Amino acid sequence: MSYNRSRRLFIGGSVAASAIGASGLSNLVSAQSVEAAASQPAVIYGPKPGVAKLNANENPFGPSPAALEAIATASAQGGAYYAYPAAMTLLDMIAERHGITRKHISLSAGSSPILSYAAVAASKNGKILGPDLFWDTTSKAPEKQGAPEIMRIANTAELDIDLDAMYAAIDDSIGMVHICNPNNPTGKVLAPNKLRDFCIKASKKTLVLVDEAYNELIDEPPKHTMIPLVKAGHNVIVARTFSKIYGLAGMRVGYLIASEENTEWINRYGMGGYTLNQAGLAAAIASYNDDAFLTFSKAMF
């Protein structure tokens, strides 16, 4: 039996309801949905059994139990609707934790889109400067639009980011400095006082982006974040994601923290939170303050 139902049936459903009855329609749709699902091809949602997938640093334990419950509820109750209210809830949670406002935060489907928006925006002002080894995928985005290639500075012999050499390379041709801390793929962590001093000096010359995707996985995460520099008015932006320790890489939720001016400027180059979905937002909201799950994941990661 065809599952071809017009929107008119649901809007003006008095005729259908009288003929079939509300429960009958529900049973009919349920039966057809089960039949349709059974005919779909098998989908692989993660690595095959026995395979340890390491290349993207996802949390192998996946979403927390609270997140899984929230995903199911949001999918059932909100799957038919756009996710604006849930996005506002997550914005408020992030803002409260860091003592900022909604206007300092831009949500995106994972941190990759917002990092790409920042790179494209910054490329209008000059080249992007980064170390030889860092997660450069998003900073390469402007190259597809004809922007110059990333200007790279050699890492030290110990694979650390050479902050002194990076600072010396900043001139009027640089539109943004991109640093990952902890760095990917080296795993090296910059001393917080050294990175803080660098960001303060460098941000007087150009925009500084610090990607903190792995911040929650290091000891004393608050000590290492550069978000206080944003609050202090420095030309610094910080990216975060729910894809790593929170186990939500497949749910696609991330965000950027910046000044109101930088947030508005970067958002011109993308759709921001409009790209998010109910299930992902529900999972992020349920996970954000789940300290027990984060402690477990950090110990086992």
What are these regions (language model features)?
Residues T101-I105, G126-K127, E212, H234-N235:
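Short acidic capping loops at alpha-helix termini that bridge into adjacent secondary structure
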Residues V29-S112, Y117:
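N-terminal small-domain helix-loop-helix segment of the aminotransferase-like
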Residues S64, N235-F301:
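PLP-dependent aminotransferase class I/II
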Residues A22-L28:
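C-terminal segment of classical bacterial N-terminal signal peptides
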Residues L163-D172, P185, V189-V208, E212-I245:
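Active-site pre-lysine segment of PLP-dependent enzymes
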Residues M1-S18:
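N-terminal secretory signal peptides and thylakoid transit peptides that target proteins
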Residues V120-I179:
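PLP-dependent aminotransferase-like
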